């Protein structure tokens, strides 16, 4: 049978697949093969929905599909599905500009859908992302994000921030999502966002590493750099030539009062605490 503008609301709690055009066949089970469809505004292609055996005591609904569309819709899919709760709403409120593609597979036991298995692979294509308000937007983002019913991981996401390139790894542990980022930063660009005291007197670029822990849309992070490539004309002990290393450590935490707290350590030279 032909399916035209059909809706498959496959299991409670998951966004429905709509506007399906394709073929439906019935036998001991059901199979829907669709050339197109829609899920939360994202275009679907090569969609397959299968119930292998209606009479099985463990009926399984298998859903496979490819989607292309705005990254913001992919984040909304995560938020509105049970995956969102498993990763502590990691993408809730995250802003995205640009498109991408999703390969998705769902194995849904119809009698106990809480045991649904998810395998998803999302590919960012030259996106701009705003993960959390404490950090500047990431631009020219490319790479892949893998999701399951319990996890989110990424090993090869690249982009730009603070005027330099960066590479990002993502992995959730328990109710926290951990992000490790490495890159280079232009001091002038850092000053535009953070406006720390004295940064307007510095010049140059340096490599950095950040360990970020995100929980309930709040980010704690530690940023470290040896400041090689950065120079300072300030009086001693804050003067520095670009070829001399000087360990910088910035720790950010948000107390219960939601005031941002930055603890800054500059080698053996200086320490400071900034509240915003």
Task: Please give the residue ranges for each predicted region.
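Extended, hydrophobic alpha-helical segments in both membrane/secreted and soluble proteins
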Residues: 1-3, 20-22, 28-32, 140-147, ...
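Extended amphipathic, helix-rich lipid-handling scaffolds
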Residues: 1-8, 24, 29, 54-117, ...
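Solvent-exposed loop/turn segments connecting transmembrane beta-strands
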Residues: 12-14, 41-43, 132-135, 161-165, ...
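Short, surface-exposed beta-strand-loop junctions and turns on beta-sheet-rich folds
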Residues: 16, 38-41, 160-162, 174, ...
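Transmembrane beta-barrel architecture of outer membranes
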Residues: 17-21, 60, 101, 138-142, ...
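Hydrophobic residues on conserved beta-strands that form the core of alpha/beta folds
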Residues: 32-34, 44-46, 154, 259-261
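Short beta-strand segments that buttress and anchor functional surface loops
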Residues: 34-39, 156-160, 262-268
């Amino acid at each position: 049978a032909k399916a035209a503008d059909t809706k498959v609301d496959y299991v409670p709690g998951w966004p429905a697949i709509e506007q399906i055009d394709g073929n439906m066949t019935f036998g001991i089970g059901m199979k829907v093969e669709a050339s197109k469809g829609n899920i939360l505004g994202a275009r679907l292609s090569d969609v397959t929905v299968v119930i292998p055996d209606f009479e099985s005591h463990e009926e399984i609904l298998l859903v496979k599909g490819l989607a292309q569309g705005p990254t913001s819709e992919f984040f909304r899919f995560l938020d509105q599905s049970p995956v969102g709760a498993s990763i502590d709403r990691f993408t809730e409120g995250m802003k995205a500009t640009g498109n991408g593609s999703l390969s998705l597979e769902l194995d849904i036991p119809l009698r106990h859908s809480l045991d649904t298995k998810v395998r998803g692979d999302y590919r960012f294509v030259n996106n701009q992302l705003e993960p959390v308000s404490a950090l500047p937007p990431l631009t020219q983002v490319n790479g892949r994000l893998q999701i399951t019913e319990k996890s989110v991981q990424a090993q090869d996401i690249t982009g730009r921030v603070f005027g330099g390139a960066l590479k990002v790894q993502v992995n959730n542990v328990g109710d926290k999502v951990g992000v490790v980022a490495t890159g280079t930063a232009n001091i002038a660009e850092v000053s535009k966002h953070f406006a720390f005291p004295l940064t307007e007197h510095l010049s140059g670029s340096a490599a950095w590493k950040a360990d970020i822990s995100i929980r309930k849309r709040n980010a704690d992070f530690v940023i470290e750099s040896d400041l090689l490539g950065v120079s300072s004309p300030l009086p001693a002990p804050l003067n520095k030539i670009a070829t001399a290393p000087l360990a910088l450590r910035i720790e950010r935490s948000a107390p219960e009062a939601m005031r941002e707290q930055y603890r800054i350590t500059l080698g053996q030279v200086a320490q400071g605490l900034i509240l915003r």
